[in-house]
Amino acid sequence: GTRVRISRELLMQLISTVPPEFTLHARNPERTVQVGGKNQIFVPMYGAPYVRDLDNNRRYGSLEDLNNFHKLAYMLPALHSSSSICCEPMEVAVPKRHLHIIDSALTHSDKPFMGIVTSKERAEDVMKMAGIVFGDGFVKDNTVVVSITNCNSPLVWDQTMLDAMRVYASHNQPIIAAP
């Protein structure tokens, strides 16, 4: 690929447009949180392919596990978000898995949730689901989902992550870009 370089001036100009903090809205307004500034938010882990059950067995996650994790996140006052992919529900086919994951986050918790970044289409589905829950007009003007993207290696971003980032950015939703 081609290495893209951004000038320091442009980078600093773009960074200056980022608000020092923003409101991440929850389905339940009482669970809405402020992100940034001196605020700390705690969320469940994200993206685990395995779970460890009460018998100490390591196994693939299931939809039941995911639902239970979202219910736990909802009940724990120390957590400010239900995340989304607390574990992968491996019995659900990949093309539809994201729908079940977001449905679980929105059904079993009224806290803020995180988006899916595994394809442009899946990110678009997340935004459609957010529009159903919050109303398209509200989503247009407010932050309702935050997503985390990561590079494959230093200096390499794949098309999947970039496409998902574009979807969320086009809806004015924040993205955590992890190195």
Regions found by a protein language model. Name each.
Residues 2-53:
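Glycine-rich, N-terminal phosphate-binding loop and its surrounding beta-alpha-beta segment
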Residues 57-179:
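Helix-rich catalytic cores of soluble enzyme domains
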